Amino acid sequence: MYASKRRQRNFKRVRDPPKQLTNTNPSKRHRERLNGELETVAMLLPYDSSTISRLDKLSVLRLAVSFLQCKAHFQACLHNSQFLSAGFPMSTHSYSYQPHPPIPFSNKVPTIFDLRIGTPMLDPEESNFEEISLKSLGGFILVLNDNGEIYYASENVENYLGFHQSDVLHQPVYDLIHSEDRDDIRQQLDSNFHIPTSSASNQFDVFAPQNSKYLERNVNARFRCLLDNTCGFLRIDMRGKLMSLHGLPSSYVMGRTASGPVLGMICVCTPFVPPSTSDLASEDMILKTKHQLDGALVSMDQKVYEMLEIDETDLPMPLYNLVHVEDAVCMAEAHKEAIKNGSSGLLVYRLVSTKTRRTYFVQSSCRMFYKNSKPESIGLTHRLLNEVEGTMLLEKRSTLKAKLLSFDDSFLQSPRNLQSTAALPLPSVLKDDQDCLEPSTSNSLFPSVPVPTPTTTKANRRRKENSHEIVPTIPSIPIPTHFDMQMFDPSWNHGVHPPAWPHDVYHLTQYPPTYPHPPGTVGYPDVQIAPVDYPGWHPNDIHMTQLPHGFTPDAQKLVPPHPQMSHFTEYPTPSTHHDLHHHPLKQDNFHLISEVTNLLGT
């Protein structure tokens, strides 16, 4: 018969006041007095009211004895006690016993003990040290006496076996173990199990300090598990050591016949096969809070009370007092959005506890609640993030604010979807902007230029912020004018252009222009002009002239004044044509257009 999770309550928790001037049965008065004492003992147990209400009379007595034994053990370690197990040497103790009269009496169990000076290090401010240490342990702690009775089990045993701590304390461990593995546990509880066979049992001292390694134990067994739907058992690896249990006389151990001090096994129990992340009974990290219209906290889940280290007497409390100072602006924007539109997008920020100043990474959303068609309160749905997810999303918060424009529960349920911003859907505003920014494909003389509007300007700015590559800006190209085209081709007339012009406006290599002689050749006929080839050009397409090295003629001689050439200086400068799009051009043509632009600009 294996253990099962069954607890029944068979006595009343609240006593009715005795009736006056009525005759009662003495046995009934005795039962009422006994029930009253049991209720008082039950309220002293370190459990919440919901757990205590499910305990029966025998469970209350069993748990009271178990916690008294644990307290007696640690009090015997911290203070001089007549129950100190002097029958075993110090090698079987968890730490060296040294009485400390100056230390005031404390009923706190030491979490860390300094072996150098033998002093317990208690930190009253570290209220959640036990919870943190159990999470980092990767298993639960189990203490067994030499008769196989569970002396102590940590609170997180429920996360691995499904049994509450109150179900297993002061119960035989064999009810939790498979019948084929019970003999292995009995052998491990025997202090002479690991004695070398070559040594005589009467000459070998297993409790000597040099033989302390023979007190170490390591065994695996199949434990009854209520969380396993396949076979109902979970293989657990038990690794620990035999130690003396102080403050526990031999007569207190159930079924014990041998006299003398009690020796027990203290071990750490971890799953033999580490469970996958999906199999772990993860804590529900979805939390909810209720706020006034100004953001003040009015109610919240019990987990939020523990996180923020506040109680109901502190309410109402301004929410901005709990938000990290660097995230107050983000919270204010979400608050304003909820007031205006009834809901806000997802926001990532940090909450800071009031006492220990611990930081929590939170992903939340706001919604407005109405009563009689009027705003009544604001509800926030929170999801706790780990430090890696929170730091990553905080770095991308500027990008997320531009994309998460509407509330979506799917992102709240799966915050890992937000780690890749490329997977987020684009809002409809950006899609409309992309449609209006498509390059024109009409065969006009010059490409159409869309008029920049505030919408397109914002879209371009968002596109630049979200882009991961730096796109080089192509310099603006001036529009060729009537005079400029006559310089390239004297036969060009206004309104008449080659047939291929609409298809490629700036592809000048197809029409090699005829450059006039520079004015410098008129004043200096003896100067030898050498053709120069520019890199990236075809030598047969365009030739530019360059003066010899070291020849610097006078500017007036280089350009002599002529009355017929006055229109050169009076001709207006070509206007710059700003295009919002970068048209793909070939590499060779790009250098050519740049040189032509410089020539026309001068």
Swiss-Prot record:
> Which coarse location class applies to the principal site listed for this UniProt protein?
nucleus
Is Nucleus set as a keyword in this record? yes
One Pfam match: PAS
Q: Does the keyword ATP-binding apply?
A: no
Q: Kindly state which keywords UniProt assigns to this record, in alphabetical order.
A: Activator, Behavior, DNA-binding, Neurogenesis, Nucleus, Receptor, Transcription, Transcription regulation
Q: Where is this region: Required for maintaining the overall integrity of the AHR:ARNT heterodimer and its transcriptional activity?
A: 41-73, 133-141, 266-268
Annotated Gene Ontology cellular components are: aryl hydrocarbon receptor complex; nuclear aryl hydrocarbon receptor complex; nucleus
Subcellular location(s): the record lists: Nucleus
Q: Where is this motif: Nuclear localization signal 1?
A: 5-8
Phenotype upon loss of function = Defects in neuronal differentiation, axon branching, aberrant cell migration and abnormal aggregation behavior on lawns of bacterial food.
- Report the GO molecular function annotations: DNA binding; nuclear receptor activity; protein heterodimerization activity; RNA polymerase II-specific DNA-binding transcription factor binding; sequence-specific double-stranded DNA binding; transcription cis-regulatory region binding
Nuclear localization signal 2 (motif): residue ranges: 28-33
InterPro entries referenced in this protein's UniProt entry, alphabetically: AHR/AHRR (IPR039091), bHLH_dom (IPR011598), HLH_DNA-bd_sf (IPR036638), PAS (IPR000014), PAS-like_dom_sf (IPR035965), PAS_fold (IPR013767), PAS_fold_3 (IPR013655)
Q: Where is this region: Disordered?
A: 1-28, 440-467
> Which stretches make up the PAS domain?
126-196
Which GO BP terms apply? intracellular receptor signaling pathway; negative regulation of locomotion; nervous system development; positive regulation of transcription by RNA polymerase II; regulation of transcription by RNA polymerase II; response to xenobiotic stimulus; xenobiotic metabolic process
Q: In which tissues is it expressed?
A: Expressed in many distinct neuronal cells including RMED, RMEV, RMEL and RMER. Functions in URX neurons to promote aggregation behavior.
Its biological purpose: Probable ligand-activated transcriptional activator. Acts as a transcriptional regulator in GABAergic motor neuron cell fate specification and development. Promotes cell-type-specific expression of guanylate cyclase genes that have key roles in aggregation behavior and hyperoxia avoidance. Has no role in carbon dioxide avoidance.
Subunit structure, as described in the record: Interacts with daf-21/hsp90. Interacts with aha-1.
Could you tell me what this protein is called?
Answer: Aryl hydrocarbon receptor protein 1
Q: Which species is the source of this protein?
A: Caenorhabditis elegans
The organism's lineage is: Eukaryota, Metazoa, Ecdysozoa, Nematoda, Chromadorea
Q: Which gene encodes it?
A: ahr-1
